[in-house]
Amino acid sequence: MSPVTVRVPAKLNLELVVGAERPDGFHDLATVYQAVSLYDDVTALPGDHLTVSVEGEGVDQVPADSSNLALVAAKVLADHLGIEPRAHLHIHKSIPVAAGLAGGSADAAGALLALDRLWDAHLDREVLVDLAAQIGSDVPFALVGNTALGLGRGEKLTPVLARGHFHWVFAFSAEGLATPDVYAELDRLRAGSVLPEPRVSDGLMSALRVGEASALGSVLANDLQRAAVSLRPDLAMTLDVGDEYGALGAIVSGSGPTCAFLARDEEQALDVAVALTASGTCSSVSSAVGPVAGARVVDA
């Protein structure tokens, strides 16, 4: 068997509306995902046992034990196929860890697709998406990519028409935020509030249909931003820098701490990136475009 390499994008929540906590501990969500051109590569190789190795961004923060989502994905797929999960997974990370960009979910999606090919299963994409939902809320979208509406825990996906491409700048933090901590802080901040059923705004869907960056920038929204900034007040300074240098929109990505800025074009994205780098409010900066395709097999 030859090695199989899969490239998987990061995700950005253009809008994230969080409902009340459910009995199972999750929250009902309404979100619009967009896949962006920050990628992890997952390579599956033949092996006698199931093992994983990691290189690149934030290696020391990535678990190498059974909690690694790529290993979880391998076991879910092997159980579905009725085989022993024998393979080595090598992950090359460029998506920051614990950054609100679903890097772990991307690795799980990459493992699913790479092992599907390595083990010669060639399951329908719909079956892989169903398996992905067993692993984590963001894993199905990492497979699908582009732009999509997510309901339930975020795993129930419907494609969204998005014309054109959008230019993004991401400001990363040296210290991550744990997603459960951010949700717990949101619950604390909203304690006693009556929450409506979550739904995305008509304004966001309209901005995507027409492909206008200025319209999209004005309707970016994230219910978790309040909680993330409460836990990390320094994020407010990062968001302010982007606003001051003309970003069309500024938002905490998912549960944070990464901040995302929408630019008018590539030139303005460079200006915003330079300003953020000079400000000292973040550890590093990257530019990306979206939407892009989901997990796909590439030449190693």
Describe each region flagged by the PLM.
Residues 60, 126-144, 272-290:
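Short, conserved aromatic-histidine micro-motifs
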Residues 63, 90-119, 137, 247-263:
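Glycine/serine-rich anion-binding loops at beta->alpha junctions
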